């Protein structure tokens, strides 16, 4: 039965360590000493209360002088009286003071709130074409993005800046191979993502030589506002080729060609992206360009952009499907190479012939086993006969010896 502290506003119980990692011990009331019991109850401010023999007080209510430590065990002195008791006000103060873990959790929540507060939707009402420029400052390269759009209704601007590769990995923005994702958004959204100093080696389909640079991509989710151009130094890009699949979805094709200082280039094709406008969820899509040098010819990298909330499930499902497919393929190769009867060139008749031969061999082995068992039994019978004959010969020898001994005794006499 667990032990509880009988003092009011005290929540200590047996098997539970204190807040400062101190061990608790419990002591019974001095029911046999009435004067001392009255002092205990008076200090507890419960004069009219009569405790039972099963009720205890914890060590937090006693001063260190009233405890006697022997062999690591704390014993209560016979004259000890509890003097430390908390009032309701102290209890409220104590509850208001959070533990370090709770403080850390609050700090983390505050940081997340601050990060979310930076992503405040800004409504813009524009009826005329407008040019918005975004410059990526770099000592070697400068990029200017000029977007001319006609906005007839309010837009939500959401910006997310990835400063280094760690932030790129922490935010879990994944480029998946040739897959179409359905992203639900209630309103058209203008999204801008800036990538700074991201090496091309982080992308699986990139070229071996790492080249770091800065790029900025603007993407529109509504087909009415997609007539925009992206211009970089020594680069050309466009956001075009948009079609409508159904009244509620839009397909966006985005191709960007990035040329570094050399003549080599990497062509990044953001293949297809389906955006469905529904009132249920609000998910952000971020387009990221990672250029790299190509040794011989420009390479084509096909990617589609995943929503942040669905990327983990999609990548895990793709990995499991790939692993299952590879395991099945390897199993077929092993069967076809190691076991001849699994080859597809062999006919059924040939297999049946092999099966009949195996059955005949099994019958021969069974007959040989019967013969060997019979031989073993005959040998066991012969061994038994020899043992009996040996016993008889030993008995005869004993009789002859006894006769000689009796003759010798008679001769001596």
Curated annotation (Swiss-Prot):
It holds the Pfam family THAP. It is found in: Nucleus. Residues 375-399 form a coiled coil. This is THAP domain-containing protein 5. InterPro entries: THAP_domain_protein, THAP_Znf. One of its GO terms (molecular function) is DNA binding. A zinc finger (THAP-type) spans 1-85. Residues 84-118 are annotated as: Disordered. The gene is THAP5. Its main location: nucleus. Keywords: Coiled coil, DNA-binding, Metal-binding, Nucleus, Zinc, Zinc-finger. It comes from Gallus gallus (Chicken). Residues 102-118 have a biased composition (Basic and acidic residues). GO terms for cellular component: nucleus.
């Amino acid at each position: 039965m667990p032990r509880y502290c009988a003092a009011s506003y005290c929540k200590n119980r047996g098997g539970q360590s204190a807040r400062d990692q101190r061990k608790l011990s419990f002591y019974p009331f001095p029911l046999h000493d009435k004067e001392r019991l009255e002092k205990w109850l008076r200090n507890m401010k419960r004069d009219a209360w009569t405790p039972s023999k099963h009720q205890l007080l914890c060590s937090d209510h006693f001063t260190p002088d009233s405890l006697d430590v022997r062999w690591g065990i704390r014993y209560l002195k016979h004259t000890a009286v509890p003097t430390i008791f908390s009032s309701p006000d102290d209890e409220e103060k104590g509850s208001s003071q959070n533990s370090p873990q709770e403080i850390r959790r609050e700090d983390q929540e505050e940081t997340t709130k601050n990060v979310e507060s930076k992503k405040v939707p800004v409504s813009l009402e524009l009826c005329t074409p407008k040019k918005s420029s975004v410059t990526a400052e770099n000592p070697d390269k400068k990029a200017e993005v000029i977007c001319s759009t006609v906005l007839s209704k309010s837009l939500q601007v959401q910006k997310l800046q990835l400063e280094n590769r760690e932030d790129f990995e922490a935010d879990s923005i994944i480029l998946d191979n040739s897959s179409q994702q359905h992203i639900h958004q209630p309103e058209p959204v203008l999204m801008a993502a800036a990538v700074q100093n991201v090496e091309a080696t982080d992308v699986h389909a990139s070229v071996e030589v790492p080249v770091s640079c800065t790029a900025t991509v603007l993407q529109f989710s509504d087909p009415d506002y997609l007539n925009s151009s992206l211009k970089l130094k020594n680069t050309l890009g466009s956001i075009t080729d948009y079609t409508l699949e159904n009244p509620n979805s839009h397909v966006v094709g985005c191709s960007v060609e990035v040329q570094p200082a050399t003549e080599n280039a990497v062509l990044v094709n953001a293949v297809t992206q389906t955006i469905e406008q529904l009132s249920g969820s609000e998910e952000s899509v971020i387009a990221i360009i990672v250029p790299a040098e190509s040794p011989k010819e420009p390479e084509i990298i096909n990617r589609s952009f995943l929503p942040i909330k669905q990327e983990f499930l999609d990548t895990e499902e793709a990995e499991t499907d790939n692993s299952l497919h590879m395991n099945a393929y390897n199993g077929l190769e092993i069967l076809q190479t190691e076991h001849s009867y699994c080859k597809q060139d062999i006919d059924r008749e040939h297999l049946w012939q092999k099966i009949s031969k195996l059955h005949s061999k099994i019958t021969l082995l069974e007959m040989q086993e019967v013969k060997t068992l019979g031989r073993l039994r005959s040998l066991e019978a012969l061994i038994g006969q020899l043992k009996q004959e040996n016993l008889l010969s030993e008995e005869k020898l004993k009789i002859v010896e006894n006769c000689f001994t009796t003759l010798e005794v008679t001769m001596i006499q």
